[in-house]
Amino acid sequence: MKHITNKAELDQLLSTNKKVVVDFYANWCGPCKILGPIFEEVAQDKKDWTFVKVDVDQANEISSEYEIRSIPTVIFFQDGKMADKRIGFIPKNELKELLK
């Protein structure tokens, strides 16, 4: 699982991958700790998507650009543009459904 730390890195990823899902999290966040393993498990099943994580405490510039106010927040990008944004914990079956 790739961890993105700066805007240039995320921009590059979005320009070279058609489908990207980004998990914005923090190490101290309880719901983030529950979502983390689910996110990684679903990433193993959904090979047509690129899964990455952004630690909001390490990547303020990215968090500000995408207006991350609560965590976890998961953003789905298609063709370099935001297609969906979910705030809060996402159950595994719902996350899989969002990636269809």
Swiss-Prot record:
Transmembrane segments: none annotated. Residues 1-100 form the Thioredoxin domain. It holds the Pfam family Thioredoxin. GO terms for molecular function: protein-disulfide reductase activity. InterPro entries: Thioredoxin, Thioredoxin-like_sf, Thioredoxin_CS, Thioredoxin_domain. This is Thioredoxin. Disulfide bonds join C29-C32. CDD domains: TRX_family. Participates in various redox reactions through the reversible oxidation of its active center dithiol to a disulfide and catalyzes dithiol-disulfide exchange reactions.
